[in-house]
Amino acid sequence: MKKGLFITVEGIEGAGKTTNLNFIRSILEESGEEVVMTREPGGTPMAEEVRELLLRPREEAVSSTAELLLMFAARAQHLEQKIKPTIERGVHVLSDRFTDATYAYQGGGRGLSWAMIQDLEKLVQAGFKPDLTLLLRIDPETGMARARKRGALDRFEREKLEFYFCVQEGYMKRVAEDPERFLVVDAQQSLEEVQAAIAQGLAAKLAG
């Protein structure tokens, strides 16, 4: 049986990930493909509990290293219980964030060692990575203005603007390391232009 594709969507807050995740799902389903949607951190009952720990605003300062380890703990569970079994069945998995977000947020935003993240990635993933990653790139000021309109902010959304410029740099460093895997789209274009670029990139991946 042919394995399903593992497709991830990345970007800072306000980049339009939810809208475009649903757009990708509709393209795949209209072509007769089965798709499972998931997210990180989260994706399984245990991993969702870790997500709540990570995102809930709290008075206690959270160690950046603790944050990183929790991300990979949730990812280990997510991979073994959901992502890998699903693609083995020939079903595509579409995820709102994956390991690139860890490099961007904990590496770029928090300033943690890239090498430390790489070591954890090797331990947890053993070479496993997405087949295609869509990175929606948006100016952090624009993205955060959009995010604030959605209502209550989680612990990450409360970070200062400078944090998101560092996150964006982290994402672009990841693109430079593995350019063939990424489809980078300017999310400040009109929705029609963004989705035309996504559709073209997805079609090329499916054809390959």
UniProtKB/Swiss-Prot annotation:
Which Pfam families does the annotation name?
Answer: Thymidylate_kin (PF02223)
**What InterPro entries does the annotation carry?**
P-loop_NTPase (IPR027417), Thymidylate_kin-like_dom (IPR039430), Thymidylate_kinase (IPR018094)
Q: Which domain of life is it from?
A: Bacteria
Cite the entry's keywords alphabetically.
Answer: ATP-binding, Kinase, Nucleotide biosynthesis, Nucleotide-binding, Transferase
Q: Give binding positions for ATP.
A: G11, I12, E13, G14, A15, G16, K17, T18
Protein name, as recorded: Thymidylate kinase
Catalysis: reaction(s): dTMP + ATP = dTDP + ADP
Task: Write down the PANTHER family for this protein, in alphabetical order.
Answer: THYMIDYLATE KINASE (PTHR10344), UMP-CMP KINASE 2, MITOCHONDRIAL (PTHR10344:SF4)
State the top-level EC class. Answer: transferase
Q: Which cellular component terms (GO) are annotated to the entry? A: cytosol
EC number(s) recorded for this UniProt protein: 2.7.4.9
Keyword Chaperone (UniProt): no
Q: Which family does it belong to?
A: Belongs to the thymidylate kinase family.
NCBIfam families in UniProt: DTMP_kinase
Query: One GO MF term, please?
Result: dTMP kinase activity
One of the GO BP terms on file: dTTP biosynthetic process
Q: What does this protein do?
A: Phosphorylation of dTMP to form dTDP in both de novo and salvage pathways of dTTP synthesis.
Which HAMAP family did the record assign?
Thymidylate_kinase
